[in-house]
Design a protein with these regions (language model features):
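Charged, glycine-rich active-site and insertion segments that engage polyanionic ligands
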Residues: 1-33, 37-46, 110-221, 225, ...
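Clamp-loader machinery-focused feature within the broader ASCE/P-loop NTPase space
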Residues: 1-99
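Short hydrophobic/aromatic-rich motifs at helix boundaries and adjacent loops
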Residues: 63-64, 83, 107-108, 241-245
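Sensor-1/coupling segment of RecA-like P-loop NTPase cores
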Residues: 83, 97-115
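AAA+/SF3 P-loop NTPase mechanochemical coupling elements
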Residues: 91, 100-102, 118-121
Length: 281
């Protein structure tokens, strides 16, 4: 596992002292390695890892099994940001008095995406941010075809990717082709007709399971390219420099909005296109 040394050390210390919590929440961005860390924790505890879903039915089955199973078990509730209120309420019951042989680990991208009462009963572990050096180390270990002499390609990864999981995602999309497309959008979004501008969304995945470029990475690339234009122009009196800066700042607002897991991505994309075009009008 790349990085997370301090967090791993802290968890191991708690396990050795016999004070590791029966219920904890791992918080971190997508692809940060939360599930991988949970797998590692189960090994340190000499426990069986039992992944479960987030539906009310899944939680009820998990609770029932937790009282029946013998031996140490780690029940892993992954990607629980969108868990229903009913499922969260069911989870409350078992986290209040966990069975002696059961540990419960929930993973979230944002700790606010669950009930206050659940947070109050859990020990929260926050994944450390990955440094560019660690992202580069991961790239060079996992993708041998991205060699050190391809500096431009590696810089795309280290600029856009916050986690190893995002490196995998960007690689699956084709980093260079993706970045070239984003640059094309930056240069032409205000020049094409309104109807053609909305075709930008055809290349972006706006629903789970839909093919296309990842929306978060697309917006991050757009911001990066806009700021590169600002640096290249480097003339405060140049009107375009200010417009590129406005596009970057406006897009960053949409990136923050995207953190809301219930956001309508299609609506967000349409609104973003209109606001970016308005900047140039």
């Amino acid at each position: 596992m790349i990085g997370q040394e301090q967090l791993q050390t802290e968890i191991q210390k708690q396990i050795k002292r016999g004070v590791f919590p029966r219920f904890c929440i791992l918080v971190g961005p997508r692809g940060a390695g939360k599930k991988l860390l949970a797998e590692q924790v189960s090994k340190w505890l000499n426990a069986t890892l039992l992944p479960t879903g987030t539906s009310i039915a899944d939680i009820r089955v998990m609770i029932e099994n937790s009282h029946k199973l013998s031996g140490n078990c780690v029940h892993l509730i992954s990607d629980a940001d969108n868990m229903s209120v009913q499922a969260r309420n069911a989870l409350l019951k078992v986290t209040e008095e966990p069975p002696n042989n059961s540990y419960f680990i929930m993973t979230l991208e944002d700790e606010n995406n669950t009930l206050d009462t659940i947070r109050s009963r859990a020990t929260i572990f926050t994944m450390d941010r990955y440094r560019p050096k660690e992202i580069r180390e991961y790239i060079e270990k996992k993708f041998t075809d991205i060699t050190k002499d391809r500096v431009s390609t590696i810089s795309i990864y280290t600029t856009l990717c916050e986690t190893p999981g995002e490196v995998n995602l960007l690689n699956s999309m084709g980093a260079l082709e993706f970045y070239e497309y984003c640059d094309k959008v930056v240069q032409n979004i205000a020049k094409v007709s309104t109807s053609n501008s909305f075709k930008i969304a055809d290349k972006v995945s706006l629903k789970d399971g839909q093919e296309g470029y990842d929306l978060k990475l697309f917006l991050k690339a757009f911001v990066t390219i806009c700021f590169d234009e600002v640096i290249a122009i480097n003339d405060p009196e140049n009107l375009e420099m200010g417009l590129y800066a406005q596009m970057a700042l406006k897009t960053d607002e949409y990136l923050r909005e995207l953190r809301n897991k219930s956001v309508n991505k299609q609506m967000l994309m349409d609104n973003w296109i209109m606001e970016i075009r308005d900047i140039w009008m």
